[in-house]
Design a protein with these regions (language model features):
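Alpha-helical transmembrane segments of multi-pass small-molecule/ion transporters
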Residues: 1-293
Length: 293
């Protein structure tokens, strides 16, 4: 599984780079982003919600989500006043939020086993409720005017999550849903890497990124300071491993994609996309160590 995940990232990154080199694909990139939202993120939301075993399993995902919201709040305080302040603050804070869907979930599958995988998936899905609100803000203040008919596509992960929760309340999830979640990890890695690299290198995002380093570092320091202590009080090793993977996560993949989709271009997002990878080896090393102790 670990080899498949690494291969997925490499293949996806190469595909995203190749796509960025072709003007024809770059023109269609916004449509590809929406296809990914509808066909990948929505399916994962549906499966994870259907397999939710107990409300108690949401405690740790809820704590991580609260920290994510705090990061967006902090980003709002350091974002200059403008007509796009709320939208830019969402993108900046989101850039410092852990990347559960395309990093923590695949790595948890490889390192922390089934328990860690379920916790990681729940973190990703609980955040969807708030990501839906973030998307609403981004659409409302988008420099590129959005059509109402695209709203349901942009919110499809949240809609799918709600459908999965309804099924969870009235039916038992079939066994194949567990297998599908586990083997989705390499696919998530490949698709996530492709869409991320292609979005970062999209012509609209090739802006000076060094001015955004200072704000990004403040937000990352806040993320690490809030998440690492939780790992020490986690009830078991898989949850602790997932928490350190969140603390030292790679950058979130959605801010560059949504920047392309809605017409934003922010130096903090650009800085996070380029520098946010440096902490990832620390998280992987700590997670492996926790599982072996």
């Amino acid at each position: 599984m670990a080899f498949a995940i690494v291969a997925g990232y490499l293949i996806g990154a190469l595909a995203g780079y190749a796509a960025s080199r072709g003007n024809r694909i770059a023109v269609q990139w916004r449509r590809l982003i929406r296809v990914q939202l509808l066909c990948v993120s929505a399916v994962l939301s549906f499966l994870a919600a259907w397999r939710l075993p107990a409300a108690a399993d949401l405690i740790w995902p809820a704590l991580v989500t609260i920290i994510a919201i705090a990061l967006v709040g902090a980003a709002y305080l350091v974002t200059p006043k403008s007509s796009e302040r709320a939208g830019r603050a969402v993108l900046r804070g989101w850039s410092a939020i852990p990347n559960p869907g395309f990093w923590v979930v695949p790595l948890a599958a490889a390192i922390a086993g089934p328990v860690g995988l379920i916790v990681a998936v729940f973190i990703d899905r609980v955040m969807i409720f708030f990501f839906g609100f973030f998307v609403w803000i981004l659409r409302r203040q988008a420099p590129i005017k959005q059509q109402m008919r695209t709203s349901w596509i942009d919110q499809s992960p949240l809609i799918a999550l709600l459908i999965g929760l309804v099924l969870n309340a009235f039916t038992e999830p079939p066994a194949w849903t567990s297998v599908a979640l586990e083997w989705a990890a390499p696919l998530l890695a490949a698709i996530g890497a492709a869409m991320f690299v292609g979005s970062v290198l999209h012509p609209s995002q090739l802006i000076p990124w060094r001015p955004g380093i200072r704000v990004w570092l403040v937000l990352i320091a806040m993320r690490i300071a809030l998440l690492v202590p939780l790992a020490f009080i986690a009830p078991n090793a898989p949850i602790a491993a997932v928490l350190v993977l969140c603390a030292f996560s790679i950058p979130a993949f959605y801010p560059p994609q949504l920047s392309v989709l809605y017409g934003y271009a922010d130096s903090v997002v650009a800085a996070a996309s380029r520098l946010g990878w440096v902490f990832a080896p620390v998280g992987v090393l700590l997670a492996v160590t926790i599982m072996r102790v």
